[in-house]
C-alpha cells in the first residue's frame, strides 16, 4: 500500500527567510494557522538548505511553543546541505536568496555526508524528528558534473546516500524515503537504483506543462505503489501573475518565453470567461491524475492558509476542462473525468 499522506503538504521555505526576512511572530502565526485549518497530522516539507537550517530550527521551536504533539506532525527533511559558519557578507550557497541568516551552507552528498545532514536536522528540530527523508535536488547535483566521469561519480554519491537512508528506514529512524526534483527525468533515472516510498515532482506536472511521457511515468510509479507529491504547481508564481517562471525572469523577445507568456494570458482570459479562479483550477489540475494524492503549497501569509486548504478540496465540472482543452490550454489527449 502506498504511503498515506493528506492532500495538502505545507512548504516551509519562508521559515528560512527566502527572499524576505520574516519576523518570529509572523512565522509563529503561519505555523499556528497550519494546525488551525488542517486535519491532523499536519505534514511540513523542509530542508537543511532552507536558510542554512533556519527553517528546521524555526519548525522545532514553534511546534514546541504551540504545544504540538509529535504524533500530530509529519516532517519531511530533504537532506544534502548542512550549515557552516558564515564568513562572508552573505551566504555563498545561493546568493541573494536567503535574507538575514546567520550561517552559510555546504553540500554534503555521500553515504556518510547524508548521515551528517540527518543528524544536524535532528539537532535543529529539537524534540521533533523528520520521518520522511530524501536527498535534496539530485537533478541539480548531477547537472553540475563537468564530464561523464564526474556525472558517474555524482550518481554513485546519490545512490550511496540513499543506501544510508534505506538503513535509517530499516532501523525505524524514518517512516519513508523518497526523492524530490525539478527534472522528473532524474527521478526516473534514480528509480532504477533506489527503492522509493514517495516522489515529489516540482515544476513538472502542471496545467501548463504535462507531457505524455511524464504521465506514463506517473502511471509506472503508481504500479509500484509509490506515493506521488506534486509541487511548484504555479511555476514559481508565474501562474499567479509573477514575473518569474521556474525561478527566472522571462524575456518576451525569446520565442520560448513569449509562448509561455501568451499561454498565461490565454489561461487567465479563459478562467475569467468560465468564472473560475486560475489558482484553484491549477491546483485541481495538479491533483487530476488519480495517482497523485498530495500537493505541496506554500504561502508566507498566515491569512492565506485557509484558502490553500480550501483549494485542494475544490472540484470543477468536466465542462471546465473541456473548455480549456478547446482553447488549446490542456493537452487534448490527457483525460480528466472530474476534479
Model region roles, listed by residue range:
Residues 1-90:
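N-terminal binding-site loop/beta-alpha segment at the start of enzyme catalytic domains
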Residues 2, 36, 63-70, 125-127, ...:
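Acidic (Asp/Glu)-rich catalytic clusters
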Residues 13-25, 99-115:
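Active-site mouth loops of central-metabolism enzymes
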Residues 26, 119, 123, 130-131, ...:
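Beta/alpha (TIM)-barrel catalytic core signal, keyed to glycine-rich beta->alpha loops juxtaposed to Asp/Glu
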Residues 86-97, 242-247:
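Short, flexible, mixed-charge acidic loops at enzyme active sites
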Residues 94-103, 148-151:
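A solvent-exposed, charged loop/short amphipathic helix patch at secondary-structure junctions
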Residues 107-129:
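An active-site-proximal structural segment forming one wall of the substrate-binding cleft
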